[in-house]
């Protein structure tokens, strides 16, 4: 199988978020701030997944063991993910628990599998940057420390 989206497509469910004000489970809680669908793809699930993880490790210079399971995320027309930070907020119960289990996130790598007809940009509001998605492109951004909201 050469397409990670086909591998996990049957498992797509409404995306969740980690929030300080509500109880969450391992995949977070549903929120109007994030209206996409997602599925987790564990390391070792297929040769393709392992190949993608190995390439991500080489690109980022992070060990494969430190890379989370891949997330397949699908945005239908009108879906969005409101401005947010990808790291876990250490001052919240859910953030502290996730950091204790798996450590703090230090970066995000997005691989674009499709070029949308419209929309789909990733915005970096503080830096006033906009990244438009295109099939085959990747976006890597890192955060050195948790940032006060």
List each language-model region with its residue ranges:
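Fe(II)/2-oxoglutarate oxygenase catalytic core
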Residues: 1-149
């Amino acid at each position: 199988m050469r397409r990670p989206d086909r591998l996990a497509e049957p498992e797509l469910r409404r995306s969740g978020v980690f929030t300080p004000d509500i109880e969450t489970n391992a995949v977070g809680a549903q929120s109007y701030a994030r209206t996409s669908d997602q599925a987790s793809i564990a390391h070792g699930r297929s040769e393709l997944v392992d190949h993608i993880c190995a390439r991500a490790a080489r690109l980022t210079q992070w060990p494969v063991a430190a890379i989370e399971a891949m997330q397949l995320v699908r945005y239908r027309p009108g879906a969005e993910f409101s401005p947010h930070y990808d790291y876990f907020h250490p001052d919240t119960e859910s953030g502290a628990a996730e950091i204790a289990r798996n450590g703090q996130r230090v970066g995000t790598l997005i691989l674009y599998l499709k070029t949308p007809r419209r929309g789909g940009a990733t915005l970096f509001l503080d830096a006033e940057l906009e990244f438009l998605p295109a099939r085959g492109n990747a976006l890597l951004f890192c955060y050195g420390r948790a940032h006060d909201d």
